């Protein structure tokens, strides 16, 4: 069994800061669970282009506010605590932080190795290992 405290991830290689967001990576590929779990803060007032061509992601908002826009149809969905979205079609999207930082629990399949950052197209590489 694994028990992981957020405070133990802070300032380690499992905390990745991209400027618009900071991701604390609880479960990663090397944990051999078949998925990864991140606690991610989307900073207020930011906009991030994301297109997970190699991963499926489910995201649950637990704090703050913002919005997600799917670029294939320009639909905008408001995000607030209690809202979950699933990028089940590798949806290209814009993620926007609202008036305050937004905290999200993110699950990826296949799992992240932990070193991923978005490329110029908003994509994580298929596998860094």
Curated annotation (Swiss-Prot):
Record field: catalytic activity: (2S)-4-acetamido-2-aminobutanoate = L-ectoine + H2O
Keyword annotations from UniProtKB, A to Z: Lyase
Disulfide bonding pattern of the chain: none
Keyword Hydrolase applies: no
Pathway: Amine and polyamine biosynthesis; ectoine biosynthesis; L-ectoine from L-aspartate 4-semialdehyde: step 3/3
EC number of the protein: 4.2.1.108
NAD keyword on record: no
Record GO terms (molecular function): ectoine synthase activity
InterPro entries linked to this entry: Ectoine_synth (IPR010462), RmlC-like_jellyroll (IPR014710), RmlC_Cupin_sf (IPR011051)
GO terms, biological process: ectoine biosynthetic process
Role: Catalyzes the circularization of gamma-N-acetyl-alpha,gamma-diaminobutyric acid (ADABA) to ectoine (1,4,5,6-tetrahydro-2-methyl-4-pyrimidine carboxylic acid), which is an excellent osmoprotectant.
Family stated for the protein in its record: Belongs to the ectoine synthase family.
Protein name per UniProt: L-ectoine synthase
Organism, scientific name: Marinococcus halophilus
Gene name per UniProt: ectC
């Amino acid at each position: 069994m694994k028990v992981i405290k957020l405070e133990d991830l802070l300032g380690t290689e499992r905390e990745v800061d991209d400027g618009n967001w900071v991701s604390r990576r609880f479960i990663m590929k090397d944990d051999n669970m078949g998925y990864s779990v991140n606690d991610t803060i989307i900073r207020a007032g930011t906009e991030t282009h994301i297109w997970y061509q190699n991963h499926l992601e489910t995201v649950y908002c637990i704090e703050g506010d913002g919005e997600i826009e799917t670029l294939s149809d320009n639909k905008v969905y408001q995000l607030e605590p209690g809202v979950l979205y699933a990028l089940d079609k590798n949806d290209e999207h814009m993620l926007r932080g609202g008036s305050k930082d937004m905290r999200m629990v993110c699950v990826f399949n296949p799992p992240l190795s932990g070193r991923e950052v978005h490329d110029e197209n908003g994509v994580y590489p298929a596998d860094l290992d």
